[in-house]
């Protein structure tokens, strides 16, 4: 039985991964509470019962950039202190982003966090991985926060016109697909030092809007479109969650 602990298990990605771990006979989800970051003994107890630790806990937005950076670094430092104290020998995987090279404090916290994780792993003989997630979307995402997909889905479901200020190119991959790929690594017992996720789709903002509008029409007509790719299926599933009640 592979014992997996998830920090940030109440977030979109954390909840999705937790559901997969609970539903697999080969894995056991180790309970975690965010308050344990401030309780060293509880955090050590958590770490001691894990074979894998997936560290999602972080904040991605805050009006105070320095506070965001310090919070994200502090959470990782507290986790690594428990890892060191318990002589943990499993895998610690840090959730990051393909856009880690950006200039925002969030991006800096991911860069510095990755460097700290690798240094600590090298000094303490546990395995580490940095998970470079693509721009993810899923049912339950927060509009104007998690993803442009969440924002567009909420607006289109409500019949609100989506304004496009810049028809930029997007790189999207559903949270479900990324969690499936991460589960494969956990079950295989092997993960690269830096993990990227396959299957991302590239499209413009206007193309995304057009796809969602076509899907909304299908939902209102109680039709299920033919999906050419899993991306289209996951996009439809996400929009449908925002359209709940429209077809009653």
Q: Could you describe each region identified by the protein language model?
A:
Residues 118-128, 134-170, 175-187, 211:
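NAD(P)-dependent short-chain dehydrogenase/reductase
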Residues 2-21:
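N-terminal Rossmann NAD(P)H-binding glycine-rich loop of SDR-like oxidoreductase domains
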Residues 69-70, 103-114, 142-146, 172:
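Short-chain dehydrogenase/reductase
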Residues 28-37:
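A short beta-strand-loop structural module common to alpha/beta enzyme folds
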Residues 177, 181-248:
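Mid/C-terminal beta-alpha module of Rossmann-like enzyme folds, strongest
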Residues 36-78, 82-85, 97-103:
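NAD(P)H-binding glycine-rich loop region in Rossmannoid oxidoreductase-like domains
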Residues 74-115, 119-124, 128-131:
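Conserved Rossmann-fold NAD(P)-dependent oxidoreductase catalytic core, especially the SDR/UDP-sugar
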């Amino acid at each position: 039985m592979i014992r997996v602990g998830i920090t940030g298990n109440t977030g979109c990605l954390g909840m999705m991964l937790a559901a997969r771990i609970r539903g697999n006979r080969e894995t056991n989800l180790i309970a975690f509470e965010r308050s344990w970051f401030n309780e060293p003994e509880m955090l050590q107890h958590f770490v001691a019962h894990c074979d894998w630790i997936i560290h999602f806990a972080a904040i991605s937005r805050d009006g105070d950039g320095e506070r965001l950076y310090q919070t994200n670094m502090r959470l990782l430092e507290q986790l690594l202190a428990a890892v060191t104290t318990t002589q943990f020998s499993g895998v610690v995987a840090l959730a990051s982003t393909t856009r880690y090279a950006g200039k925002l404090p969030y991006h800096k916290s991911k860069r510095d966090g990755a460097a700290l994780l690798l240094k600590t792993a090298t000094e303490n003989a546990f395995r580490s991985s940095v998970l470079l997630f693509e721009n993810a979307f899923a049912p339950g995402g927060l509009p104007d926060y998690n993803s442009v997909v969440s924002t567009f889905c909420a607006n289109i479901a409500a019949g609100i016109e989506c304004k496009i200020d810049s028809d930029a190119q997007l790189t999207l991959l559903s949270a479900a697909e990324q969690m499936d790929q991460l589960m494969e690594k956990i079950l295989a017992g092997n993960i690269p030092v830096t993990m990227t996720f396959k299957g991302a789709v590239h499209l413009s903002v206007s193309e995304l809007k057009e796809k969602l509008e076509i899907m909304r029409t299908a939902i209102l007509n109680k039709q299920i479109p033919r999906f050419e790719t899993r991306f289209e299926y996951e996009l439809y599933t996400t929009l449908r969650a925002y359209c709940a009640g429209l077809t009653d």
